[in-house]
Amino acid sequence: MADTIWYTRCPVPTASGIAFQRDMFADEFDGSDYDVRNIKELGKEKADSHFNHALDNCFREGGSIPPLWAKQGGADTVMVGLTFLSDAICFYVRPDSDIKTMQDLKSKRVAVGVRPYIMIDFMKINGHKAWDCGLRAHGMTLDDVELVEVEINDDMHSHINPDPKTGEKPPGTLMFQNELDALNRGDVDAIWVKGCQTRQMERELSGEIRLISDLLYDTDNPELKVNANPRIITVSGNIARDNPDAVVRYLQVLIRAARWSADQPRDSAQILATELGVSLSDINGAFVENYQNKLWPNLSAETMHLLSTQQDFMLAHDYLPGEVDLASWCDDSFLRKAYERENLTWAA
């Protein structure tokens, strides 16, 4: 009987999502000692493993905040890859607002959604960092605005690993609905939204919100585009130690998915739009140009540096009680071997 490799992914563009939608894991591991399955099959009682990485034999690809938090807390994980894909980070006001630019936010109230029920409130950190970067990109700081917490009681666990094949849909603009409601009530003067939800919201709420800045276009500084990215590929320590070949084979699948995405950009865009629960036009306008060619796993010095800026922010604002040694957490031997087996140049 085959052992199970569990995987989990965030609702963002990932090679894991493409591989899952195209049955590439099944193709690679068919007839092997492993069966690759979605942690969603384990039910809600195991859903937190997406955040704390407490499940053995598990791979995760997604936002950087939970893996950093879990590792600092003692999770037995290995970082085996990174990707960096800039996405829209947008700031909106009401259409009748006298706020025209980011500089007009001086002394204004800006929304940060908070979810007290979740073990690591990554969206609060995302919001805090989005405002930090958005203001810095326009010569301001967090001291220039009032951060207003908007409490949210949704179910983030339901957003983990949606399976479009079964009709499940990712959260879409619902992830920012509470902040939007606060804006419309007048509780805050501005909100932030990221990723393909920006274009979806602009399309669905045309005339009801007004964009004042988008960091995808308003800054060339990659450090100011870091918001839950670089995405991290982590694996449970037990499988890295006990069956390194399985880790290499898993990464080979991600490399193949990244190559397919680069070679078939139109098909890739459609798969990712389905994966994220948005239209094709939404996804094509929400990410850096040629985003379909940005899913290659790597551990380059540049991407590692960008990850360090995410950690620095978390440390500075007490979201991490201590520093993760990124160099010792990272093991590039698996990814090097995977590229070698695929006869491709190591993407360092």
Name the predicted role of every residue range:
Residues 3-158:
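Short, glycine-/small- and polar/acidic-enriched structural segments
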Residues 18, 22-23, 186, 294, ...:
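Short glycine-centered helix-capping/turn motifs at secondary-structure transition points
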Residues 26-30, 217-223, 294-302:
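Short, solvent-exposed loop/beta-turn-alpha elements that line the ligand-binding surface or hinge
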Residues 27, 103, 129-133, 181, ...:
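Solvent-exposed, polar/charged alpha-helical surfaces in well-ordered, non-transmembrane soluble domains
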Residues 31-39, 140-147, 276-288, 321-328:
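Short, surface-exposed acidic
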Residues 65, 156-159, 163-271:
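Pocket-lining segment of extracytoplasmic ligand-binding domains
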Residues 241-319:
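Secondary-structure end/capping motifs
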Residues 312-348:
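Conserved C-terminal helix/tail region of periplasmic/extracytoplasmic solute-binding proteins
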